[in-house]
């Protein structure tokens, strides 16, 4: 029996999840029952079919009254703004993938459950009161049947935590710092316009823009041993997709570049990290990682070691596509924890 899922919020991540579901052939594992999005059906269908970042969707898409039809599959389409009015019970939903970016606390999750969903997975960091934050490949094995309100973390946490964990297990990590070099996002302006964050009021295509980040807190949440030992900053750059992470680590043992790269290469075949962590030595640029399903790709040519214990690494991710694939992986892990 397939897992019956609904998607609440059909923006960049919601649409990427649907694309990943069909393009990966996982429709034999999941049944997409319902999509709830305030936008009109014509816009929903059009932006699923045509995407400036990921190209044309290679499956048929059409819409009719209250339905989106993908590759012949009829998916209920609703436009409900109140969580307390969603039709999950009537639709017998197993897991809601909440991709709005608007909700993220336990009460929000329970609103979905009170409407009939069995479980909820947020596509962004959740508050401290939710049942679990999962970085697939790192702690998805800890899920239990009682974890009903779950967060998939952030794209950057999914990108960096596997690398930190591998290096820590191999050499021992003392502390670290990270600079996230992130593509533009929907909260930025096309041209200068008012925004409460004055830096975000500037045109996205014209500047490298420093922004706030809670990445260090996200690392501590998954790897609590590092509490107070990581710092992070972030900038947005004028590209529409793919993120690079500039990672610096101080380790407890003497290492060389080969040691670091070999540890990463070995970890890519680890059962939990297979399909999550990747490694390359090709001379690639950011666009080459567009539509890459991994959470993190280590660029071995950029690994550096200073004074035997200070490591610098460059880690890439498609901040949309990799994360969308992990949403499906985590949803599957939530279902398996129930059985």
Swiss-Prot record:
Lipid metabolism in keyword set: no
GO cellular component: cytoplasm
Enzyme superclass (EC): oxidoreductase
Domain of life of the organism encoding this protein: Bacteria
InterPro entries associated with the record: E4P_DH_bac, GlycerAld/Erythrose_P_DH, GlycerAld_3-P_DH_cat, GlycerAld_3-P_DH_NAD(P)-bd, NAD(P)-bd_dom_sf
UniProt: substrate binding residues: 154-156, 213-214, 236
EC code(s) of this entry: 1.2.1.72
Catalytic activity: D-erythrose 4-phosphate + NAD(+) + H2O = 4-phospho-D-erythronate + NADH + 2 H(+)
Pathway: Cofactor biosynthesis; pyridoxine 5'-phosphate biosynthesis; pyridoxine 5'-phosphate from D-erythrose 4-phosphate: step 1/5
Subcellular location: Cytoplasm
GO MF annotation list: erythrose-4-phosphate dehydrogenase activity; NAD binding
Keyword terms: Cytoplasm, NAD, Oxidoreductase, Pyridoxine biosynthesis
One Pfam family this sequence matches: Gp_dh_C
Function: Catalyzes the NAD-dependent conversion of D-erythrose 4-phosphate to 4-phosphoerythronate.
Subunit structure: Homotetramer.
Family: Belongs to the glyceraldehyde-3-phosphate dehydrogenase family. Epd subfamily.
Listed name of the protein: D-erythrose-4-phosphate dehydrogenase
Protein species of origin: Colwellia psychrerythraea (strain 34H / ATCC BAA-681)
């Amino acid at each position: 029996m397939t897992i019956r899922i609904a998607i609440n919020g059909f923006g960049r991540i919601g649409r990427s999840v649907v694309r990943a579901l069909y393009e990966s052939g996982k429709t034999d594992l999941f049944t997409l029952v319902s999509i709830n999005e305030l936008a009109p059906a014509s816009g929903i269908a059009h932006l699923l079919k045509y995407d400036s970042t990921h190209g044309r969707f290679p499956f048929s898409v059409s819409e009719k009254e209250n339905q989106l039809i993908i590759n012949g599959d009829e998916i209920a389409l609703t436009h409900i703004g109140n969580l307390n009015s969603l039709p999950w019970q009537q639709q017998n939903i197993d897991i809601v993938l909440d991709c709005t970016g608007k909700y993220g606390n336990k009460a929000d999750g329970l609103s979905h459950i009170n409407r009939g969903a069995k479980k909820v997975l947020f596509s962004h960091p959740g508050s401290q009161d939710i049942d679990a934050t999962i970085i697939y490949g790192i702690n998805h094995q800890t899920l239990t049947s009682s974890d009903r309100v779950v967060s998939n973390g952030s794209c950057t946490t999914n990108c960096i935590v596997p690398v930190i964990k591998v290096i820590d297990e191999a050499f021992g990590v003392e502390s670290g710092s990270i600079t996230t070099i992130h593509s533009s996002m929907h909260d930025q302006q096309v041209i200068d316009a008012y925004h409460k964050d004055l830096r975000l009021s500037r045109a996205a295509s014209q500047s490298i823009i420093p922004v706030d980040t809670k990445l260090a807190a996200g690392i501590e949440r998954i790897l609590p041993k590092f509490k107070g030992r990581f710092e992070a900053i972030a900038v947005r750059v004028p590209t529409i997709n793919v993120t690079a992470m500039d990672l610096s680590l101080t380790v407890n043992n003497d290492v060389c570049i080969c040691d670091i790269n070999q540890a990463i290469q070995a970890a890519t075949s680890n059962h939990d990290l297979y399909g999550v962590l990747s490694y390359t030595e090709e001379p690639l640029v950011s666009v080459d990682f567009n539509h890459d399903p991994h959470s993190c790709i280590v660029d071995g040519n950029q690994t550096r070691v200073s004074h035997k214990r200070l490591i610098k690494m460059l880690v890439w991710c498609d901040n949309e596509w990799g994360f969308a694939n992990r949403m499906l992986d985590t949803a599957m892990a939530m279902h398996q924890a129930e059985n």
